[in-house]
Amino acid sequence: MKQTIKYKLNPKREQEGHLHNICSIATKLYNTDNYQRRKVWEETGKIPSVYTQKKLLKDNVWFKLLPSQTAQEVSFTLQRNYNSWFKLRKKDNTANPPMFRKKEMLSPITFYQQFKIINNQIKLSVSRKYKEEKGIKSLEIGFDLWREDKGIAKMCQIIFNKGEWFAHVVYEIA
């Protein structure tokens, strides 16, 4: 059984800057990926798979600035959006493909294996390139309402909503 718990994060100013930066990078990667998919769609009438896109994007600066699984999740999200568009298009031929995200939008970032929860802190890994550019090893962010014995943390999604940061953590409960 799985359970999702939402934590309100309390990042320090520097940590908030890094979170903002990483979420902005995810938005830029989403838009780059979307641009390439649309280009292929216009040329061939087909959308490339997530794995084809990964090969095309592996040298992209935005792809390298995110942890690998986080960057892949951005592509999977876009793929799900395109799959939804294809289903809708069968019913309504005027349906539009997924839109580009606005520059100022902060995309959610998802971590699977690159995070740890210790007491009332979430430790998030960053990519090698981000470490080199920003000089940090990881982000350790405090949060409210720590409850122990929830099970094994499997996934963490960081979301910015109405001026506040939240972590949605999915636990596997035995």
Language-model features: where?
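Nucleic-acid substrate recognition interfaces
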Residues: 1-174
